[in-house]
């Protein structure tokens, strides 16, 4: 049949359970009632194209009429049990329940049409047309009653005859009908034969027997081929009945799922993280439940819950099969024969079971049937008291379920049986029924078997012992069956002593097996017997001998099934034989009983359909013979379902989910795959899965082993899912998803690890590891530490196995190291073998974690081999830590004694030995590794020591020697290169090798060797080189100057562009190249992006040539280069976008200055938003919220974040999730917002969130946080006596930022967390003030080493960067030998002034480096850049011979590299000009008095620095040498005025008078322009903002020079001061101070308020009067308004211009406004003014950064109270000057608080401005 039958099955299944539980209508029992519909449907299905024939319809009516006969049973075969009359329920009773119901009319109409159909007054087609809607509504009502949760409110019209198909029935008569059934004792008795004699009934075609009960359903499942014209009839039925049925079905499934979730959750529970973040791991079922509660869609089909296989009996049906237990005879002694035992009397057996006692069970029915033939005609009433339970204890079930209570409730008197005596049942039938109990769990089985054995031994031998398969023997009755059969079979002596005979008869089989239970192992499963088996059967026999090979861990122990063992995969003896045709045909001739066993599974037709379909579903069904299920299925099912109340009460917690699971699985089995489409199947699968979770056995019965992969796939897809942030402020969904993922990982990782161990899914492992790497460190730590040790170790092993496929990204390496370290903590002992096994993960470990391995680690050759294999991925600090372990004397002795084998094995670690140790290597040791050193990645000091032993300058073939040195040639001096192989060929092998050194950073582009290379290139000419050859010179490109570039063609320049991306092009070169390479028209986005390395060359001309539409889309490629732009270039970009609508010309003719109308809305590119001044940041709250996903990620400045926070008007009750959704915008949070957070927990969560922002926490907010925290902890201020427990939960970043006064209160563990963080990120330490750094270092030392004890080597290594901030006393506790071995580490640390001074003194002590007069080159190599810690006098004492050109260049280069590094830049060491001058004095000055000063060449300048030479020496340089070193002169900030004039004189010789300087030349001269006079400055062409900004960026002009620059620009441009716009004000830079105060007053306040962002970042050399005028511009209407109205963000925006605010306005500033001042603004306030405007309470409100910025000149003007206030702020309240006692200190604090109240009225004067 082409059309789907699934809607019909749903209809039938909805009727079946509903009728069973609600309406067995007397004579029209379930059998008869359903036979009507089933036969009718089967008739429709089998109908041919023509109309139904008269004969077929007559047969159908005969079947129907026989089904509706009241109170009559057909005569059964001779010997069958008599029919038993079920209780009657008349049709009248049913009609009574319909009175008053809205369904009265449609139900009567349905009944009438049914009668008309039966009377042939109506055709089936007409019947469907008239009653389709009523039938569909009836099905929906019955299904709604079946599914828990109640039907939804009807929204469709009521059903009527000929009405619409989409309708509903009220079904208000169902409850009344239920009550009626209960009142009429509706439980049916058992009937053992069909209502119609199958031998007399006629089929629809006149030949086949008529179906009974569900044979109509069998016809549906095996339909005829073609329907022909009746197909339309089926289609109509499907459309009318199926659609509403499926809709109701889906609604019911939804209700089931939702109601089950809470119920299953209450049963199973769910692991949740506790307060400490730890979570006790759940199991697989809890993981699946968690997923369904968190909207994960499990693939139920892949898990096995939609497999379509019949379900095994659940615990509920196991309970149904128990019934009332029977008393059993005591077991005889083992040696007594069964035939000698006393037989159990049937009369005695029936004495205790006079009638079936409800609720019924299979065993009760069987005993009842056995006793019927010996009873009198009128049986006595059954007893009214329950039978006691059996005295013999029952074997407990093997499931993990609780054992049900078998105590029966008081019985209810049933209907008496018929009074007419019936013939006794056939003994064969009765004893065939005993086969049920050979495999039954029912307690009555033992008594039944004994009785059948004693009364009918022949039938017992034939039915049980001869036909029951070996594998079916199971359960508690197995021992009794063995004993009973052993007594009936021939003596065991008939068992042959040798091999098992063929054929194997049942007698021989039972005799042999019962004689010895190990028959299979001892006789069949031996080598000789196996060889005797035919070859085609050997595999099967071997499988039987071995038994099923199941993984016990996959399926927890549950009950056994009818096959005697667990058969989840069909691997049992019986199923394997029946399913294998070859095996079946080979065994049946010898074992005849197999044919009976395999009838059902092999499709035999000698059993009823219902038994074949439902047999596996119900407990203890018989494998042979006719069963009650076939003879009378309706009463049988009613009898079982009548026991539901008792069995539900016995297991109340599992009754509902287990019952639903069974019904749902039965429904799935009957419907078949694909029912209702994918949506319905998914809902059904989820309901099935959910209902199986509480029952361990139901779950594992269905769960497939391959379902583990599906679980991993679903979890992996969920972890990879990125939840979109919903519109609006509430982003709780996406954040909730992140929290759910965290909960999943925290609570179910052990389950996932176990699944991964079994499935080996690399994709799932990679996904899981990625999720771990994204977890916060503290959450990851809690996860790993709360897992079982074995589970964590197994997961680490799994990672190691799949390491090659995990593909960790560079950004994830730190997190991977953290994860690896946590997993290592689960190992009780770290061994060398473990190190070798996990060697791929070693590069990710932090040094402390690496040092947890035993010290003897490196003594293992395999460990050294593992280090060699993975050294390329290891960090330098890791290699340094391991290299230091090589120096342990107990391992390998002293360095000069190390053998060659050790040196080769430890080669990757040798470059990381301390230099003082590496210098101990002898020339013989070095030469032994001659071929290995070039790849060893040596540092400069180590490389020079190796070169001294390897380079032989007397050899003739110097080029070969240099090539053999490889990378070591990078460290050769120019003199050595000149003696070995003079450089001459731009493309020669030596030259190319040196260029590679420059490319990887080993060779400095500013060094002397690089200068030699440049000379080769210049001498040969760049025009002769091809573009490819020219590209290799890109590392030296900045040193080529301008002239060389002008000689190159455009093709050569374009070819070099890709190579310039990693090079630092000078601004002058960028201007030149950008102008040459930028297309004059039709510029595309791709062309602009290709020029992005040249973006610092942006000029007015090039910017004008770039179309605005191209700039709009260029953020992706230009964004990373914006940080290299000057302030003026940024202003020009902003002005380009701002000028788009409403432009007005404010300038003179020909000099049109485009000025945007104030307040004009502008759309900015995303990358420019963080660069906008506040005046241009016109974003309203709606725009912010609409684009929150973008704005939350932008790196807003402090003042921008504060400004936008005010714009958003964030409510005070905003949740943490919504705050997190703001991202970097939350950095603008105000102190008032923090103070209004009531809960301490919420407060700490918000603080943690702020400290996780990449933009950091501004100083004012930080001060607010700690003040508020102390207040909340109810601690006395300013001194805390105790520390609350909340601080132990603070993040490590907060602990690092802890105020000084709280450091002493922290625990040792907290301090160590800070130390570890500082080691990993020293930049965060350098962001602290010097006082804070020293306090932290001293507190860490106090934790590591007791006071006044020497500091050990381990303590120094643990302190890391904190060593540089120790005080004098602590520094002197370092033993000098340990200090000597630690010098290489100190060279990479920032050193505080105190420590550096003390270190310089310690270096001169004898155990360290000794007196400087005795230093050699080795001592200088060891000291490195630490030589600058010496005094200038000590440096001058170093012998000139030790400071040769090569040594001096390397020493200065190392220090320059340090200064240019990120740590060096943040360190900001003091000026070292005098020390550098003392260091190079031996080269710069003549060797003896009276000798002429040397004239430097460019090589000498590169070997030292320009400022080391005097003006006379500079002026005497050769012009070519000066041109080659021009970039060095222009970039040296140490040149004095005389040296600048001398250098500028050389530049004028080179390029002519200043009036001819081109823009790129002016830019290249840089600071040298200060050497020009006022008249020469006026000759410069200063028309556009590009040239003007070149001068505006230079600091150091005199006042006359400033005036000359500004006046020249105004004159040449023809502009008036009032017409200066945003761009030109920014371009003026420092030179803005060249305008007189009266000129400054004419500047547009609107334009200046925008330029204030850039001008305020400069330390302007303006006078106090000029600063006041600039500040006045900002309070005008075009600016920011009155100072009193300014928020902290405006003070931060204007920077140093705030120093010009009048005294009265400054003195009226409030705490928040004062904290908005930048530290630079604090430092530039004139000292007298600073002392006047700020009182002590205002000074005490300074942040720590502001207080540290107070200059000594300002402190000198302060009063004692003011200085104490500054000290208070610097030390954050910890230290009060000693002359102020404790009481005075508190008095000062109280006075501070009171002074604020006095200061508030003063603020009103700010309105005067």
From Swiss-Prot:
This is Stereocilin. The keyword Signal applies. Residues 378-399, 407-426 have a biased composition (Pro residues). Residues 376-426 are annotated as: Disordered. Residues 1-22 form the signal peptide. GO terms for biological process: auditory receptor cell stereocilium organization; detection of mechanical stimulus involved in sensory perception of sound; inner ear receptor cell stereocilium organization; protein localization; sensory perception of sound. The keyword Glycoprotein applies. One of its GO terms (cellular component) is kinocilium. Essential to the formation of horizontal top connectors between outer hair cell stereocilia. InterPro entries: Stereocilin-rel, Stereocilin_LRR. The lineage of its organism: Eukaryota, Metazoa, Chordata, Craniata, Vertebrata. Glycans are attached at residues 63, 200, 295, 352, 364, 467, 516, 580, 605, 696, 860, 952, 1000, 1213, 1308. Keywords: Cell projection, Cilium, Glycoprotein, Hearing, Signal. It is found in: Cell surface; Cell projection, Kinocilium; Cell projection, Stereocilium. Belongs to the stereocilin family. Strongly expressed in the inner ear, detected in the testis, and barely detected in the eye. Detected in the six sensory areas of the inner ear by immunofluorescence. Expressed only in the sensory hair cells and associated with the stereocilia, the stiff microvilli forming the structure for mechanoreception of sound stimulation.
């Amino acid at each position: 049949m082409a059309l789907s039958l699934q809607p019909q099955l749903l209809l039938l299944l909805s009727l079946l359970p509903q009728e069973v539980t609600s309406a067995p209508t007397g004579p029209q029992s379930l059998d008869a009632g359903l036979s009507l519909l089933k036969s009718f449907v089967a008739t429709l299905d089998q109908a041919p194209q023509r109309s139904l024939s008269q004969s077929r319809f007559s047969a159908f009516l005969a079947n129907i009429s026989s089904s509706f006969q009241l109170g009559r049973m057909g005569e059964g075969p001779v010997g069958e049990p008599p029919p038993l009359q079920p209780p009657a329920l008349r049709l009248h009773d049913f009609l009574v329940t319909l009175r008053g119901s809205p369904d009265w009319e449609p139900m009567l109409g349905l009944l009438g049409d049914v009668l008309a159909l039966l009377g042939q007054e109506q055709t089936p087609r007409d019947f469907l047309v008239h009653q389709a809607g009523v039938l569909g509504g009836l099905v929906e009502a019955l299904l709604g009653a079946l599914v828990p949760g109640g039907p939804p409110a009807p929204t469709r019209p009521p059903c009527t005859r000929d009405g619409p198909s989409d309708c509903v029935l009220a079904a208000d008569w169902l409850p009344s009908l239920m009550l009626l059934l209960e009142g009429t004792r509706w439980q049916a008795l058992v009937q053992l034969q069909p209502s119609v004699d199958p031998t007399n009934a006629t089929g629809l075609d006149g030949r086949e027997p008529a179906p009974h009960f569900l044979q109509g359903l069998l016809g549906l499942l095996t339909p005829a081929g073609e329907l022909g014209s009746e197909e339309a009839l089926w289609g109509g039925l499907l459309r009318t009945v199926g659609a509403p049925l499926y809709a109701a079905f889906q609604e019911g499934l939804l209700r089931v799922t939702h109601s089950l979730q809470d119920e299953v959750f209450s049963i199973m529970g769910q692991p949740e993280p506790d307060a400490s973040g730890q979570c006790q791991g759940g199991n697989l079922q809890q993981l699946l439940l968690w997923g369904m509660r968190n909207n994960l869609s499990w693939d139920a089909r892949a898990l096995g819950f939609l497999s379509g296989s019949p379900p095994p009996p659940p615990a509920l049906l196991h309970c149904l099969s128990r019934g009332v237990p029977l008393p059993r005879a005591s077991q005889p002694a083992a040696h007594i024969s069964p035939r000698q035992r006393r037989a159990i009397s049937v009369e005695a057996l029936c004495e205790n079971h006079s009638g079936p006692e409800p609720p019924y069970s299979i065993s009760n029915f069987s005993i009842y049937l056995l006793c019927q033939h010996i009873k009198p005609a009128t049986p006595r009433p059954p007893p009214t008291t329950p039978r006691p339970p059996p005295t013999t204890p029952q074997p407990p079930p093997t499931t993990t379920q609780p054992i049900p209570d078998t105590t029966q409730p008081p019985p209810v008197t049933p209907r008496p049986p018929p009074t007419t005596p019936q013939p006794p049942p056939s003994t064969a039938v009765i004893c065939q029924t005993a086969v049920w109990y050979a495999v039954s769990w029912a307690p009555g089985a033992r008594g039944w078997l004994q009785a059948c054995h004693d009364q009918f031994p022949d039938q017992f031998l034939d039915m049980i012992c001869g036909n029951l398969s070996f594998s079916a023997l199971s359960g508690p009755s197995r021992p009794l069956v063995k004993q009973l059969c052993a007594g009936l079979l021939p003596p065991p002596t008939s068992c042959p002593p040798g091999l098992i005979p063929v054929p194997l008869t049942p007698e021989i089989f039972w005799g042999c097996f019962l004689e010895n239970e190990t028959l299979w192992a001892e006789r069949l499963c031996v080598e000789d017997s196996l060889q005797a088996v035919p070859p085609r059967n050997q595999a099967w026999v071997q499988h039987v001998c071995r038994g099923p090979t199941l993984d016990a861990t996959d399926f927890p122990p549950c009950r056994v099934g009818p096959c005697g063992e667990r058969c989840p995969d069909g691997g049992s003896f019986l199923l394997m034989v029946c399913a294998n045709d070859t095996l079946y045909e080979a065994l049946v001739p010898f074992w005849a009983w197999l044919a009976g066993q395999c009838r059902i599974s092999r499709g035999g037709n000698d059993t009823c359909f219902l038994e074949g379909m439902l047999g596996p579903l119900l407990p203890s069904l018989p494998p042979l013979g006719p069963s009650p299920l076939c003879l009378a299925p309706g009463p049988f099912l009613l009898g079982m379902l009548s026991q539901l109340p008792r069995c539900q009460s016995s297991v109340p917690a599992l009754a509902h989910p287990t019952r639903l699971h069974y019904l749902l699985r039965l429904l799935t089995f009957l419907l078949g795959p694909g029912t209702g489409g994918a949506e319905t199947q998914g809902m059904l699968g989820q309901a099935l899965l959910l209902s199986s979770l509480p029952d361990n056995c139901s779950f594992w019965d269905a769960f497939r082993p391959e379902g583990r992969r599906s679980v991993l796939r679903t979890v992996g897809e969920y972890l990879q899912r990125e939840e979109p942030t919903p519109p609006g402020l509430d982003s709780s969904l996406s954040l909730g998803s992140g929290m759910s993922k965290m909960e999943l990982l925290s609570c179910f990782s052990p389950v996932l690890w176990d699944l991964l161990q079994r499935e080996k899914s690399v994709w799932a492992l990679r996904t899981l590891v990625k999720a771990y790497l994204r977890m916060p460190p503290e959450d990851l730590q809690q996860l790993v530490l709360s897992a079982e040790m074995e589970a964590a170790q197994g997961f680490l092993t799994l990672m190691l196995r799949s390491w090659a496929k995990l593909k960790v990204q560079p950004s994830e390496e730190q997190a991977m190291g953290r994860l690896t370290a946590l997993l290592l903590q689960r190992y009780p002992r770290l061994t060398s073998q473990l190190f070798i096994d996990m060697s791929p993960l070693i590069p990710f470990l932090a040094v402390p974690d690496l040092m947890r391995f035993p010290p003897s680690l490196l003594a293992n050759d395999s460990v050294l081999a593992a280090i060699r294999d993975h050294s390329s991925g290891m960090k330098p600090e890791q290699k340094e830590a391991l290299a230091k372990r090589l120096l342990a004397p107990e391992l390998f002795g002293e360095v000069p004694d190390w053998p060659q084998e050790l040196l080769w094995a430890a080669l990757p670690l040798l470059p990381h030995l301390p230099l003082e140790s590496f210098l101990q290597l002898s020339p013989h040791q070095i030469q032994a590794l001659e071929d290995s050193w070039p790849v060893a990645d040596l540092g400069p000091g180590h490389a020079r020591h190796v070169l001294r032993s390897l380079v032989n300058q007397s050899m003739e073939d110097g080029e070969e020697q240099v090539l053999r040195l490889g990378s070591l040639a990078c460290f050769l001096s120019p003199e050595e290169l000149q003696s070995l192989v003079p450089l001459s060929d731009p493309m020669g092998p030596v030259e190319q090798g040196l260029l590679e050194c420059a490319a990887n950073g080993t060779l400095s582009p500013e060094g002397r060797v690089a200068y030699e290379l440049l000379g080769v290139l210049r001498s040969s000419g760049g025009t002769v080189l091809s573009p490819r050859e020219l590209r290799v010179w890109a590392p030296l490109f900045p040193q080529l100057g301008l002239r060389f570039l002008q000689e190159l063609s455009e093709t050569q320049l374009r070819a070099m562009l890709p190579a310039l991306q990693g090079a630092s092009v000078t601004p002058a070169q960028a201007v030149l190249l950008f102008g040459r390479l930028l297309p004059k028209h039709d510029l595309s986005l791709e062309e602009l992006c290709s020029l992005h390395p040249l973006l610092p060359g942006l000029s007015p001309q090039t910017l004008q040539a770039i179309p605005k539409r191209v700039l709009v889309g260029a953020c992706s490629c230009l964004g990373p280069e914006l940080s290299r732009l000057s302030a003026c270039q940024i202003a020009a970009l902003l002005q380009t976008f701002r000028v788009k609508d409403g432009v007005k010309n404010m300038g003179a003719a020909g000099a049109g200055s485009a000025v945007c109308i104030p307040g004009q809305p502008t759309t900015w590119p995303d990358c420019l938003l963080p660069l906008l001044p506040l005046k241009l940041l016109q974003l309203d709250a709606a725009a912010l919220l609409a684009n929150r996903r973008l704005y939350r990620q932008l790196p807003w400045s402090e003042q921008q974040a504060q400004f936008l926070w005010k714009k958003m008007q964030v409510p005070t009750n905003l949740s943490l999730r919504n705050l997190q959704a703001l991202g970097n915008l939350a950095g603008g949070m105000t102190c008032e917002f923090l103070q209004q957070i009531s809960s301490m927990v919420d407060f700490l969560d918000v603080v943690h969130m702020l400290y996780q922002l990449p933009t950091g926490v501004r100083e004012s907010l930080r001060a607010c946080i700690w003040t508020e925290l102390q207040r909340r902890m109810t601690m006395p201020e300013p001194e805390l006596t105790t520390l609350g427990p909340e601080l132990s939960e603070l993040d490590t970043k907060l602990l690092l930022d802890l105020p000084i006064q709280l450091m002493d209160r922290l625990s040792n563990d907290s301090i160590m967390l800070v130390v570890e963080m500082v080691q990993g990120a020293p930049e965060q330490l350098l962001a602290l003030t010097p006082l804070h750094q020293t306090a932290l270092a001293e507190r860490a030392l106090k934790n590591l080493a007791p006071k006044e004890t020497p500091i050990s080597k381990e303590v120094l290594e643990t302190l890391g960067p904190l060593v540089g901030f120790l005080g004098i006393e602590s520094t002197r506790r370092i033993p000098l030998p340990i200090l000597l071995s630690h010098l290489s580490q100190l060279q990479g640390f920032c050193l505080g002034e105190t420590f550096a001074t003390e270190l310089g003194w310690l270096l001169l002590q004898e155990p360290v480096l000794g007196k400087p007069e005795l230093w050699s080159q080795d001592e200088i190599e060891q000291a490195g850049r630490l030589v600058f810690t010496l005094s200038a006098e000590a440096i001058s004492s170093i012998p000139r011979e030790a400071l040769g050109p090569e040594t001096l260049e390397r020493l200065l280069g190392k220090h320059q590299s340090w200064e240019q590094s990120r740590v060096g830049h943040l360190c900001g060491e003091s000026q070292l000009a005098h020390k550098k001058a003392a260091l190079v004095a031996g080269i710069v000055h003549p060797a003896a008095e009276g000798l002429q000063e040397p004239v430097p060449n460019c090589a000498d300048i590169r070997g030292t620095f320009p400022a080391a030479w005097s003006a006379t020496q500079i002026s005497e340089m050769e012009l070519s040498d000066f041109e080659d070193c021009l970039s060095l002169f222009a970039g040296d900030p140490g040149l004095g005025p005389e040296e600048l004039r001398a250098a500028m004189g050389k530049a004028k010789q080179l390029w002519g008078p200043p009036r001819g300087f081109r823009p790129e030349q002016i830019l290249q001269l840089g600071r040298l322009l200060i050497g020009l006079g006022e008249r020469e400055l006026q000759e410069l062409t200063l028309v556009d903002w590009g040239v003007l900004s070149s001068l505006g960026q230079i600091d150091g002009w005199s006042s006359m020079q400033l005036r000359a620059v500004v006046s020249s620009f105004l004159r040449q441009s023809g502009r008036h001061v009032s017409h200066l716009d945003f761009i030109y004000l920014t371009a003026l830079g420092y030179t803005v101070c060249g305008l007189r105060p009266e000129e400054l007053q004419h500047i547009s306040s609107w334009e200046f308020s925008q330029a204030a962002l850039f001008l305020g970042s400069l330390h302007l050399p303006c006078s106090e009067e000029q600063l006041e005028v600039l500040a006045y511009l900002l309070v005008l209407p075009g600016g920011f308004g009155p100072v009193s109205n300014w928020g902290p963000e405006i003070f931060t925006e204007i920077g140093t211009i705030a120093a010009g605010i009048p005294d009265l306005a400054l003195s009226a500033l409030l705490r928040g406004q004062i904290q908005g001042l930048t530290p630079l603004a604090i430092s530039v306030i004139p000292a007298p003014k600073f002392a006047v405007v700020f009182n002590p309470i205002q000074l005490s409100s300074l942040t720590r950064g502001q207080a540290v910025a107070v200059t000594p000149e300002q402190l000198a003007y302060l009063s004692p109270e003011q200085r104490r206030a500054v000290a208070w702020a610097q030390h954050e309240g910890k230290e009060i000057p000693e002359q102020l006692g404790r009481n005075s200190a508190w008095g000062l604090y109280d006075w501070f608080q009171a002074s604020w109240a006095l200061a508030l009225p003063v603020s009103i004067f700010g309105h005067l401005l």
